């Protein structure tokens, strides 16, 4: 998690290559620094490096509902909620510059936002954020659901990606049963089935 590259488009091969080169160079530099500045680390070697860099953010769909950071902060309740998750933000660089104060405030996001789970606050994810506006028989799960740039840093957690994935899978099965499009799925029935799978959804 040490090396980071900013301002790259993960859908462009040129940017992927640039990011790979930058991050691998950073790894070499930090290892060299540790070896030369810490006696106890003078003999360390690189055992392995991830086969490719991972992106925290990329394209997101335009869904029937776009989640916003304001909704998450307000703990907005939706009639079509399919997941509830602890309030958590982890964004390395909203503006591609590492100069933030680690807090979420206003719309002038800068640098580094990191707010771990500190209390009982949660946010909900509506089913509509999984449903694209223009494609009838498609559901999207994970970090690419419909959300704004900063809200994405709260929804990209792996466990929440799993929850949206489970909801999408159950909804797809329900759509087949009901012979309906994804937007027409009976959300109350979807929520009922998710609760049977021990998913904690408000009544």
Predicted regions and their residues:
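Flavin (FAD/FMN)-binding glycine-rich loop and adjacent Rossmann-like elements that form
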Residues: 1-203
